[in-house]
Curated annotation (Swiss-Prot):
This is Diaminopimelate epimerase. It is an enzyme of class 5 (isomerase). It comes from Aliivibrio fischeri (strain ATCC 700601 / ES114) (Vibrio fischeri). One of its GO terms (cellular component) is cytosol. It is found in: Cytoplasm.
Length: 276
């Protein structure tokens, strides 16, 4: 099997992006794991696949696979790279691109300054839709993990997120507690674990342990989920700069009933071809 791909990243959250409109490729979980290997393969956090639209009202279908081979519902940084890829490869010349995902639809907008704004839809807090085991929706839940009780928020941005406010995110043991939260029994489909330090009502620092990938340089949907939880807990304003290890994202959310918007960069690194 021979195919072309692009390597891209959004603030260091890196992707292998493949056009499956003009190429016929089947990505098995084993193949994805081999390609994701940073020593023996291409190396990436997620594989992004461009497919023909499933819905006539959309331009493309957007599929996301983690480095462990599992398919997931959403990836915000990947969505920005997806938008840049389809324009760069001449698959569309639109500046407003509609895509379907495993769990919904998104609008991707290419801005004049070359940043990409993603309409992430409305954050979902109903426990059964996240999914999260709870009798009713709360702003804060108590999670017992190992030797700690975490005071956390839970939200879906098309994929599940658990957000915990901490005093010093740089010193926090994200690897230890990220793994424990990711596989916590109250999240039946596992969860992305975000740890957020509030600098001001309009600025936070965030580290995210991604489900199936570990800690990444940036997580777009994680930044969106963190801000949504912070706003619901009355800790943040409507516009927030989120500083991640890989760089900054700008998040805007006017509250329940409104869509959330994420703006940030998408970088093309190189193009390649593989024979498998």
């Amino acid at each position: 099997m021979h195919f072309h791909f692009s390597k891209m990243h959004g603030l260091g959250n890196d992707f292998m992006v493949v056009d499956c409109l003009t190429q016929n490729i089947f990505f098995s979980p084993d193949l994805i794991r081999r390609l994701a290997d940073r020593h023996r393969g291409i190396g990436f956090d997620q594989l992004l696949v461009v497919e023909a639209p499933y819905d006539p009202e959309t331009d493309f279908h957007y599929r996301i696979f983690n480095a462990d081979g599992s398919e997931v519902e959403q990836c915000g940084n990947g969505a920005r790279c997806f938008a840049r890829f389809v324009r760069m490869k001449g698959l569309t010349n639109k500046t407003s691109i509609s895509v379907s995902t495993k769990k919904g639809k998104m609008i991707l907008k290419v801005e004049d300054d070359d940043q990409i704004t993603v309409n992430m839809g409305e954050p979902v807090f109903e426990p059964n839709k996240i999914p999260f085991k709870a009798t009713q929706a709360e702003k804060t839940y108590l999670l017992r993990v190992d030797d700690k009780t975490l005071f956390s928020g839970a939200v879906s941005m098309g994929n599940p997120h658990c957000v915990t406010v901490v005093d010093d995110v740089d010193a926090y043991d994200v690897d230890k507690y990220g793994q424990l939260v990711e596989s916590h029994e109250r999240f039946p489909e596992r969860v992305n674990a975000g740890f957020m330090q509030i600098i001001s009502p309009n600025e936070v620092k965030l580290r995210v342990y991604e489900r199936g990938a570990g800690e990444t340089q940036a997580c777009g949907s994680g930044a969106c989920g963190a801000v949504a939880v912070g706003i619901m807990q009355e800790l943040l304003g409507e516009e927030v700069k989120v500083s991640l290890p890989g760089g900054d994202l700008h998040i805007v959310w006017q509250g329940p009933g409104k869509p959330l918007f994420m703006t940030g960069p998408a970088t093309h690194v190189y193009d390649g071809q593989l024979s498998i």
